[in-house]
C-alpha cells in the first residue's frame, strides 16, 4: 500500500506523515524535530506528541525515498513508519503503547508495590511475613520491577542517552538506576552504614506507570470527537452487482451482496437499509426516506429525501430502503474531508507552543545539570554550611539493620554523600517535561474536536490562537449576512429589446455560475419558461461581472462601472435591492433589480459580537445604499459600511485595518472574498461558499450558520485559556518542585522530597495537564447551554 503522501502546489515539495512510537515528553518531540530538520532536503517538520505523528515537508528532488526519514527517527531509538493510507476514514486512532499492555504493566508494578509495602507494615505491626523484612527480598523485588514492568521505560531511556537525545525515560533510568546501585553498595558493604533505597525503584515505577496509564486513557478520551466522526463510516454495504440490467422500479428489491466500503468506486449502486449509515456521497436513484444528518449539518430534525436528492456519507437512513449511485467514495467524500481537516488541525501547532518547545528542547540536559550540581553542592559545601540537615530524618528510606533486615527508624545523622545522592535522585525524577509537551497539543486536540462536533472545521491550532485574539470582525454582505437567495423583482429595460430576451441573455452569461445573483437570474428565466440560449466566449471577472457573446452581440453583465457604458444618469431602484447592469458595446440594455433577505440569525450575531467588545464592519461590492440598508436592519451604523469595493480592494481594506494593529477576521463566501479571506488574520468561510473561498479560509462553517462564528470565537478563547493554564502549571510545577527536590528549602524549613514522592509528583503533574484539557469539554458545553441562542 502506498504511503500517505500529499503533493503541494510546488511540484518539488511533498508532505508526508510518519507514525512515531515511543515519544513520552516534549524532549522526545524536540529530538525528533531536530534530527529531521538536520536531514538534507527537509523543509519543515511538525511533530505531535498526542497523535504520535510527524508531518514532514521535503524536497522530492533531494529525497527520492522517504524511508530515509524513518531511518533518521529510528536512529534516535524510536520506532517509526510511514503512514500507509491517505484515506482518513480508514486510519485508526493512535493508541501507542496499547492500553491493555500498559494496564498489565501497572498491575504487576502495583503488586510489587503492595508486597514491598507489606514488609514495612508488618514490621510496624510486629507481624512481618517470613522473609519480607529481609533486604535481599526487597532487592529481588526491585530487580523484578526494573526488568519487568519498568523494562520498556528503562530501555527507551537508555536509547535516548545512547543516541544523544535524552528524554523523560532517561531521567527515570538515571533516578532508579542510581537508587538501585547505591542500594546494592549498601547491601554488599554494610559496614559503610549507607541507607538502602530498595523500595524507591518499586514505588517510583509504580507511580510513573499509574500516571502514564491514566494519562493514556485521558489521551484516548481527548480524541473522542475524531472517533465519533470515524464511526459514521460503515465498514460494509449492500452492493448491486449489475444495476444496468435492472429496471429502475426493481432496484429497491434487487439482490445485493455485502461489499467493503473501502472498495467502492464512483458509479457503483448501493442499497441502504433503514437504520444503516450511507457509505458514499451520491444521488438517490430509487426510494424515498428520511435521514438523520445532525452529525454533519447540525439539523436536529430528520430530513426527507427522494429520488434525485444528493446525500452524504455518514448520514443515517431512518425509515425506508434507498438505492444510491455513488459519486464520491473513500477519501473523496465530505465526511472524509471533515475528518482530514480535523486531523490536520490537530497536527498544526499553535504559536504559543513555540515557547514550550524552546524550553523542552534542552530541558532534560538542564535537569541533569541541576541534579549534578545538587549532588556536588550537598556532598561538599551544603553539609558544611548547614550541618543540621544531616541530623534530620530522610522519610521513606530503608536502613540496614545489623541482621541484614530492615527498620523503619532513621539514623540520627546521615553522611553528606547519602544526602546528596538522595536529593540528586529526587531532582531527576521530579522533573516533568511531559507536562510541557502535553500542555498545548492536548488542548488543541480537544478544542478542534469540539469544533468539529459543532460543524466548525479549523485548519489548525494556529488558527484557534489567532481567532481568540480577534476583536475586529468584517462581514461580506451577499450570502454571508444575507441568505444569498436573491429574487428578481424587476427588469428595467433601457433599450428597445424585449425583456424576456434580456433575461435570456443574462441567464446565458451566468450559466454554470454558483453566485447567488447568477442563480436568481437562472431561476427567473426557468420560472418564465424561457428557452435557454447559448453564450460563447464567456469570461468571468470576480467581483465585477461576466462577458460573452449572445445572438452575435458582445455583452457585459455586472456593475455599471465595469460595463463601461457612458450614461448621464443611471436609473434608481429600491435602496435595499441589488442591481445588475447589462450592456453591449454601444449602450446600457437593462438593469435587473434583485432583492435578498438577511439571515434570521444575522442581527443577533452582530449584536452579540458588539456586546463582547468586538468591532463589526460590512465590506461589500454591492451598492452603498443597499449595503447601508442592510446595516440598519442589523443595528449597525452607516459608518461601519464600506461598499462598492473590488475584490483586490477588499484585501487592501483588510490589510489597512491590520496595519493599525488590529487582528481582523473576515467572514465571506464568494470568489471575490478569497483575497480578503487570505489576507485576514483569520478567514472564515461558510459551507455554501465557493471552493476558492473555502480554500482561502482558516475556518469553515460546515453548517452554514452565522452563529457558528460566535461558537468558534468562544471556543477559541476557552482553548487559549486552557493552553495558558496548562503552560502555567507545567512551568510553575518545575519552577517550584525542582528547587524543592534539590533541597533549597531543607536548611530553613526542613522540606525535601524522597525519590518516591518525587516520582508521584511527576506523574500527577502530567496527568493534571491532560485532565485540565479534558475539562474544556465540560466548560464549553456548559457555555453552550448558558449562552444566548441565535
Curated annotation (Swiss-Prot):
GO cellular component: plasma membrane
Spans within the Extracellular topological domain: 126-134, 190-193, 381-416, 750-753
Catalytic activity annotation: Cu(2+)(in) + ATP + H2O = Cu(2+)(out) + ADP + phosphate + H(+)
Gene3D superfamilies xref list: 3.30.70.100, Calcium-transporting ATPase, cytoplasmic domain N, Calcium-transporting ATPase, cytoplasmic transduction domain A, HAD superfamily/HAD-like
Cytoplasmic topological segments: 1-105, 155-166, 212-357, 440-726, 777-790
Residues that span the membrane, as ranges: 106-125, 135-154, 167-189, 194-211, 358-380, 417-439, 727-749, 754-776
Binding-site residues, Cu cation: 25, 28
Protein name listed in UniProt: Probable copper-transporting ATPase SynA
PANTHER family membership: ATP7, ISOFORM B, P-TYPE CU(+) TRANSPORTER
Keyword vocabulary terms for this entry: ATP-binding, Cell membrane, Copper, Copper transport, Ion transport, Magnesium, Membrane, Metal-binding, Nucleotide-binding, Phosphoprotein, Translocase, Transmembrane, Transmembrane helix, Transport
UniProt EC number: 7.2.2.9
Function of the protein: Involved in copper transport.
Recorded topology in the membrane: Multi-pass membrane protein
Species name: Synechococcus sp. (strain ATCC 27144 / PCC 6301 / SAUG 1402/1) (Anacystis nidulans)
The keyword ATP-binding belongs to this UniProt entry's keyword annotation: yes
Gene from which this protein is expressed: synA
Active-site residue list: 476
Subcellular location: Cell membrane
Amino acid at each position: 500500500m502506498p504511503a500517505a503522501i500529499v503533493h503541494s502546489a510546488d511540484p518539488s515539495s511533498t508532505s508526508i506523515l510518519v507514525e512515531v512510537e515511543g515519544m513520552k515528553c516534549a524532549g522526545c518531540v524536540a529530538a525528533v524535530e531536530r534530527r529531521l530538520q538536520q536531514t538534507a532536503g527537509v523543509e519543515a517538520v511538525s511533530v505531535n506528541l498526542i497523535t504520535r505523528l510527524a508531518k514532514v515537508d521535503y524536497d522530492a528532488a533531494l529525497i527520492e525515498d522517504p524511508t530515509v526519514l524513518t531511518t533518521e527517527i529510528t536512529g534516535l531509538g524510536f520506532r517509526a513508519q510511514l503512514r500507509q493510507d491517505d484515506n482518513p476514514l480508514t486510519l485508526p486512532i493512535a493508541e501507542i503503547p496499547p492500553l491493555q499492555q500498559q494496564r498489565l504493566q501497572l498491575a504487576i508494578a502495583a503488586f510489587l508495590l503492595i508486597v514491598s509495602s507489606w514488609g514495612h507494615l508488618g514490621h510496624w505491626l510486629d507481624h512481618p511475613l517470613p522473609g519480607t523484612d529481609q533486604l535481599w527480598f526487597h532487592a529481588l523485588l526491585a530487580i523484578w520491577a526494573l526488568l519487568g514492568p519498568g523494562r520498556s521505560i528503562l530501555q527507551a531511556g537508555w536509547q535516548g542517552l545512547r543516541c544523544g537525545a535524552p528524554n523523560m525515560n532517561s531521567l527515570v533510568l538515571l533516578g532508579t538506576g542510581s537508587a538501585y546501585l547505591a542500594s546494592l553498595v549498601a547491601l554488599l558493604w554494610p559496614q559503610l552504614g549507607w541507607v538502602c533505597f530498595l523500595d524507591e525503584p518499586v514505588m517510583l515505577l509504580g507511580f510513573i506507570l499509574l500516571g502514564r496509564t491514566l494519562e493514556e486513557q485521558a489521551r484516548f478520551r481527548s480524541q473522542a470527537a475524531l472517533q465519533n466522526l470515524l464511526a459514521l463510516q460503515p465498514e460494509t454495504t449492500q452492493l448491486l452487482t449489475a444495476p444496468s440490467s435492472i429496471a429502475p422500479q426493481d432496484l429497491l428489491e434487487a439482490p445485493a451482496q455485502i461489499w467493503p466500503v473501502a472498495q467502492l468506486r464512483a458509479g457503483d449502486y448501493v442499497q441502504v437499509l433503514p437504520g444503516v449509515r450511507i457509505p458514499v456521497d451520491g444521488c438517490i436513484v430509487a426510494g424515498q426516506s428520511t435521514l438523520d444528518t445532525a452529525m454533519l449539518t447540525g439539523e436536529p430534525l430528520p430530513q426527507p429525501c427522494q429520488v434525485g436528492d444528493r446525500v452524504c456519507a455518514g448520514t443515517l437512513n431512518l425509515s425506508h430502503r434507498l438505492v444510491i449511485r455513488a459519486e464520491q467514495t473513500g477519501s473523496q467524500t465530505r465526511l472524509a474531508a471533515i475528518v482530514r481537516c480535523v486531523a490536520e488541525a490537530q497536527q498544526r501547532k499553535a504559536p504559543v507552543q513555540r515557547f514550550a518547545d524552546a524550553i523542552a528542547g534542552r530541558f532534560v540536559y538542564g535537569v541533569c545539570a541541576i541534579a549534578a550540581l545538587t549532588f556536588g553542592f550537598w556532598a561538599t559545601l551544603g553539609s558544611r554550611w548547614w550541618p543540621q540537615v544531616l541530623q534530620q530524618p530522610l522519610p521513606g528510606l530503608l536502613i540496614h539493620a545489623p541482621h541484614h533486615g530492615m527498620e523503619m527508624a532513621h539514623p540520627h545523622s546521615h553522611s553528606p554523600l547519602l544526602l546528596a545522592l538522595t536529593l540528586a535522585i529526587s531532582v531527576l525524577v521530579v522533573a516533568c517535561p511531559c507536562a510541557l509537551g502535553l500542555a498545548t497539543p492536548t488542548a488543541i486536540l480537544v478544542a478542534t474536536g469540539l469544533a468539529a462536533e459543532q460543524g466548525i472545521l479549523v485548519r489548525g491550532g494556529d488558527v484557534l490562537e489567532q481567532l481568540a485574539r480577534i476583536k475586529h470582525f468584517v462581514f461580506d454582505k451577499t450570502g454571508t449576512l444575507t441568505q444569498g437567495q436573491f429574487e428578481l423583482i424587476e427588469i428595467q429595460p433601457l433599450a428597445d429589446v424585449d425583456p424576456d430576451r434580456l433575461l435570456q441573455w443574462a441567464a446565458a452569461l451566468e450559466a454554470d455560475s454558483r453566485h447567488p445573483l447568477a442563480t436568481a437570474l437562472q431561476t427567473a428565466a426557468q420560472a418564465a419558461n424561457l428557452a435557454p440560449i447559448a453564450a460563447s466566449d464567456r469570461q468571468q471577472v470576480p467581483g465585477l461581472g461576466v462577458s460573452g457573446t449572445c445572438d452575435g452581440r458582445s455583452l457585459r453583465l455586472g456593475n455599471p462601472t465595469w460595463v463601461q457604458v457612458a450614461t448621464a444618469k443611471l436609473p434608481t431602484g429600491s435602496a435595499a435591492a441589488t442591481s445588475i447592469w447589462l450592456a453591449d458595446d454601444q449602450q446600457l440594455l437593462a438593469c435587473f433589480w434583485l432583492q435578498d433577505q438577511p439571515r434570521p440569525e444575522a442581527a443577533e450575531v452582530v449584536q452579540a459580537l458588539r456586546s463582547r467588545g468586538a468591532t463589526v464592519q460590512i465590506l461589500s461590492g454591492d451598492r452603498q445604499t443597499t449595503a447601508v440598508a442592510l446595516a440598519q436592519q442589523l443595528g449597525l451604523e452607516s459608518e461601519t459600511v464600506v461598499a462598492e469595493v473590488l475584490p483586490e480592494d477588499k484585501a487592501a481594506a483588510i490589510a489597512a485595518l491590520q496595519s493599525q494593529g488590529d487582528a481582523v477576521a473576515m467572514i465571506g463566501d464568494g470568489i471575490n472574498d478569497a483575497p480578503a479571506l487570505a489576507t485576514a488574520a483569520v478567514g472564515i468561510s461558510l459551507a455554501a461558499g465557493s471552493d476558492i473561498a473555502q480554500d482561502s479560509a482558516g475556518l469553515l462553517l460546515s453548517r452554514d450558520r452565522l452563529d457558528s462564528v460566535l461558537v468558534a470565537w468562544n471556543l477559541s478563547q476557552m482553548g487559549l485559556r486552557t493552553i495558558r493554564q496548562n503552560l502555567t502549571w507545567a512551568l510553575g510545577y518545575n519552577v517550584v518542585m525542582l528547587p524543592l527536590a534539590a533541597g533549597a528549602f531543607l536548611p530553613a524549613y526542613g522540606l525535601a522530597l524522597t525519590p518516591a514522592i518525587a516520582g508521584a509528583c511527576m506523574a500527577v503533574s502530567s496527568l493534571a495537564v491532560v485532565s485540565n484539557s479534558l475539562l474544556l469539554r465540560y466548560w464549553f458545553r456548559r457555555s453552550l447551554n448558558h449562552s444566548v441562542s441565535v
